């Protein structure tokens, strides 16, 4: 790893716990995803949650749209270890039901959860059972009066929606909560989070909502979340992709890894290749990524096709492979090298 270590001054925030996972304060930034199975299909949902846990998910969110889904949630919760967030919209009574079943966090949407008395009922239940809440504001479901006031989603509209419900929780003397202000537009989301970060001390859950497919969504999320994380904003994140949720976890860790905020597994440094390459760099990288994806120990591995940059990259990596004179050279340190035939690489 390079000796140059950038300094990111993290925003100060209070610490809460989602299950056994600390969020905020000095805790590592948590990476989470959301199931896309039918929650009433208990077997499929449990299998997906366990798959997400295997690739490093700290927290998994599960949509609970009906009372039948709430009953299924009870069975799901009994079969998994990773903390679960119940995603609640429209019917506050579902939140009360899953609270009985050991949910680790409740996500409520201010745009559709209803009157303050319903929020009070959820808060009272959460307090009694020591369950944190996420106030999840979304540009696509702002309250009608805010839509009329601002005309369209704006950073100020997202902030006002969030603060409106933060005020309710403050008034109810409930401080075990985190907040998100998501939008599909990168600049809208980033500016809303910047405003929110200045306004409150609670942990922030980051996300660019409805970001798109695997490629475009990963890029939008990397840009938006990367901007915020580099400014020290953010305590937990989800990369929202129209793809396998496992990819959300992988991309989330890749974003944190790129900013040297939190590392998990191998960080591959590979050249884009040109006619100077002495071995199949692309094939080697693809094979190693698949073969070594279960490794969780942080490690930098450089795979460079020729001697132009290969030796230099290898010296700041834990292990380097570089092409040279029709051979591949494996470099462990400046003084430990081994040449192998290209066919053996």
From Swiss-Prot:
EC number in record = 1.17.7.3
Question: What reaction gets catalysed by this protein?
Answer: (2E)-4-hydroxy-3-methylbut-2-enyl diphosphate + oxidized [flavodoxin] + H2O + 2 H(+) = 2-C-methyl-D-erythritol 2,4-cyclic diphosphate + reduced [flavodoxin]
Q: Name one Pfam family in it.
A: GcpE
Q: Which residues are [4Fe-4S] cluster-binding?
A: 271, 274, 306, 313
GO biological processes? isopentenyl diphosphate biosynthetic process, methylerythritol 4-phosphate pathway; terpenoid biosynthetic process
Pathway field of the UniProt record reads: Isoprenoid biosynthesis; isopentenyl diphosphate biosynthesis via DXP pathway; isopentenyl diphosphate from 1-deoxy-D-xylulose 5-phosphate: step 5/6
> What Gene3D superfamilies does the database record attribute to this sequence?
Dihydropteroate synthase-like, Sulfite Reductase Hemoprotein, domain 1
Q: What class of enzyme is it?
A: oxidoreductase
Q: Which SUPFAM superfamilies match?
A: Dihydropteroate synthetase-like, Nitrite and sulphite reductase 4Fe-4S domain-like
List, in alphabetical order, the Gene Ontology terms for molecular function in this entry: 4 iron, 4 sulfur cluster binding; 4-hydroxy-3-methylbut-2-en-1-yl diphosphate synthase activity (ferredoxin); 4-hydroxy-3-methylbut-2-enyl-diphosphate synthase activity (flavodoxin); iron ion binding
Which UniProt keyword terms apply here?
4Fe-4S, Iron, Iron-sulfur, Isoprene biosynthesis, Metal-binding, Oxidoreductase
The lineage's top-level taxon is Bacteria
**Textual note on the cofactor:** Binds 1 [4Fe-4S] cluster.
Which family, according to UniProt? Belongs to the IspG family.
The record's section on NCBIfam families has: ispG_gcpE (TIGR00612), PRK00366.1 (NF001540)
Task: Sum up the protein's function in the record's words.
Answer: Converts 2C-methyl-D-erythritol 2,4-cyclodiphosphate (ME-2,4cPP) into 1-hydroxy-2-methyl-2-(E)-butenyl 4-diphosphate.
Q: What is this protein called?
A: 4-hydroxy-3-methylbut-2-en-1-yl diphosphate synthase (flavodoxin)
Gene assigned in the entry: ispG
